[in-house]
Amino acid sequence: MTPQDLKDVMSSGLLSFPVTDFDSNGNFNAKGYAARLEWLAPYGASALFAAGGTGEYFSLYGEEYGQIIKTAVDTCRGKVPIIAGAGGPTRTAIAHAQEAERLGAHGVLLLPHYLTEAGQEGLIAHVEQVCKSVKFGVIVYNRDRTRFTPESLAILAERCPNLVGFKDGMGNIETMSAIFMKMGDRFAYLGGLPTAEVYAAAYKALGTPVYSSAVFNFIPKTAMAFYEAVRTDDMATQHKLLKEFFMPYLKIRNRVEGYGVSIIKAGAKLVGHDAGPVRAPLTDLKPSELEELKALIDKLGPQ
């Protein structure tokens, strides 16, 4: 897939980040992960992100990364494109991006670097080195310590033809407007705030109609229905689902830092697609919280 092909894929439809399956000892469960992807692939997502934030990229080590990407690529070949996550220190991000390309992934989402602060010149150097280390398309993730100005993105766009996507996880309306006005159709734009459905209509108004859905991991039918409501400006359906599911869901998710991933694995377990526990430092939902989540899921009906 060429960078332009990746940009085209990222420009429409719903995206999602499958959770990564671990066994009871916390080791990668390739069989379970393949079964998960086989279940999710037919629901119609434009692309799936392997080893992304929801896939606990931050906890992976050693050979696990390659095993996860290979399992995803092999399982979804001919069904749905696979975009690999890569991040952390520049050399780690480069190594993972190159491995993902070698294994047949269709592009890479460049996740934030770790721990240290960096100015715009440093961020530009980081992204440029990763982009120039691979031939396939790169999407940069704007969040946490990795926050780009419109001017920095313009420099990167000129230097890196294979940088084709911008995913926003900050939600700063003024900055997003400035980026969109400056860069126009040079990038595909993705909404990437946690529980993106809550912000989907606002992002669409900014020129960013595409977003990644975490709840697709356990309520894929509802996730696709919500995306269709956003696409067609069906506000009645959006408001109904926001009121009945997403807003009470947020109350559970926001109780503990890190629950943004934990609640997704909990949901998958409740619908019969258990992905195992989250890895430390994340913690799983408490039994009472599982019951709360189950009640919300049950109201939605079969998926």
Curated annotation (Swiss-Prot):
Reactions accelerated catalytically: 5-dehydro-4-deoxy-D-glucarate + H(+) = 2,5-dioxopentanoate + CO2 + H2O
GO biological process, one term: D-glucarate catabolic process
Keywords on record: Lyase
GO molecular function: 4-hydroxy-tetrahydrodipicolinate synthase activity; 5-dehydro-4-deoxyglucarate dehydratase activity
Enzyme class name: lyase
Pathway the protein takes part in: Carbohydrate acid metabolism; D-glucarate degradation; 2,5-dioxopentanoate from D-glucarate: step 2/2
InterPro entries, sorted: Aldolase_TIM, DapA-like, Dehydro-deoxyglucarate_dehyd
EC number: 4.2.1.41
SMART domains: DHDPS
Entries under CDD domains matching the protein: KDGDH
Family as reported in the entry's similarity comment: Belongs to the DapA family.
HAMAP family found in the cross-reference section: KDGDH
Xref: NCBIfam families: KdgD, PRK03620.1
UniProt-recorded name of the protein: Probable 5-dehydro-4-deoxyglucarate dehydratase
Lineage per the UniProt record: Bacteria, Pseudomonadati, Pseudomonadota, Betaproteobacteria, Burkholderiales
